[in-house]
Amino acid sequence: HALCIILEYLLSTKKFPSGVKVARTIATTHLLDKISEKYKVPILETDVGFKYFAKDLEENKLVMGCEESAGVNIYNWTTDKDGILAVFLLAEIMTTTGKDLSELYAEIIKTYAIPNYKRVDIPTTTEQKEKIKKIDASTLKGVSLGGGKVVDIRTTDGIKLYGENCWILIRPSGTEPIIKLYAES
């Protein structure tokens, strides 16, 4: 929720050079895409990890880079994941608007949609994680998702199936003995 509040605030109140983008990792809410679309700012989806958009940050090509853990970096302010910056920005937003976070998020969902986002961590073994990494995307063609067609499949960082109005990602953690399952509709 915090990432959406921050992005809406930045795009609606700050000036950025033309050609900048918003970057989010593969596991991060697509509600950010809807906010970016409203302001005609392209969205860039990367694998998990700030290293995948560090170059664009250093060259001031991103308004914001973020991941689902609420790590964020902002144009010309930081070049790595920074939770303290997010807290300060949220304090600025609440002070400027006179609204608390629940009011600000209520405005977001009223404007864009109510996303149903969920992450589940499944304890696993190294062998099971390796099996996930070896799944061939071609074996998933023709499956349905959320009652509709799968419109795209991405396998660079786990397996992500994109439906018409939803997505699901199965991703072995790179740091813990778990498989992370993400879904949003």
Where are the regions a protein language model picked out?
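Phosphate-binding and adjacent anionic-ligand microenvironments
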Residues: 13, 17-184
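Cysteine protease catalytic core and zymogen-processing segment of caspase-like enzymes
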Residues: 1-11
